[in-house]
């Protein structure tokens, strides 16, 4: 299991990223560490929000690196929506530049921290 962290200072957000080979093996540890209730670990990725400004990105590496990259994009999109809502910004299809930059920032940070 690999655990990395980063901040999004502009929105005062704290992100934990957990990468595991088979998250089912870590379910008890992860549930205690992040105060989770999820017991079904047959997934590619998940987002848990512990508070308005603390989020946990769970990534399951058992499907391989190529699948992992698309999962990071997918979960980064969900996380960008969660963050935008938590800071009071409603998604706007005609003015979505802020969300596009946030999505890129999240994806690039996760990719860099996990050395992918």
Model-derived regions: residue spans:
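Post-HExxH zinc-binding segment in Zn-dependent metallohydrolases
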Residues: 90-116
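Short, solvent-exposed segments of well-ordered alpha helices
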Residues: 63, 67, 91-94
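Catalytic Zn2+-binding segment of zinc metalloproteases
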Residues: 76-93
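Short alpha-helical catalytic segment bearing the HExxH-like zincin motif
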Residues: 67-75
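Short, charged/polar N-terminal "headpieces" of proteins
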Residues: 1-38
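Active-site scaffold of zinc-dependent metalloenzymes
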Residues: 28-66, 79, 83
């Amino acid at each position: 299991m690999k655990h990395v962290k980063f901040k999004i200072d502009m929105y005062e957000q704290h992100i934990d990223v957990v990468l595991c080979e088979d998250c089912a093996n870590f379910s008890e540890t992860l549930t205690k560490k992040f105060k989770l209730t999820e017991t079904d670990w047959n997934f590619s990725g998940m987002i848990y929000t512990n508070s308005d400004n603390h989020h946990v990105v769970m990534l399951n590496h058992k499907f391989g690196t190529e699948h992992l990259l698309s999962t990071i994009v997918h979960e980064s999109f969900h996380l960008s929506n969660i963050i935008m809502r938590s800071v009071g910004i409603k998604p706007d299809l005609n003015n979505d530049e802020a969300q596009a930059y946030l999505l890129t920032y999240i994806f690039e940070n996760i990719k860099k921290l996990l050395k992918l």
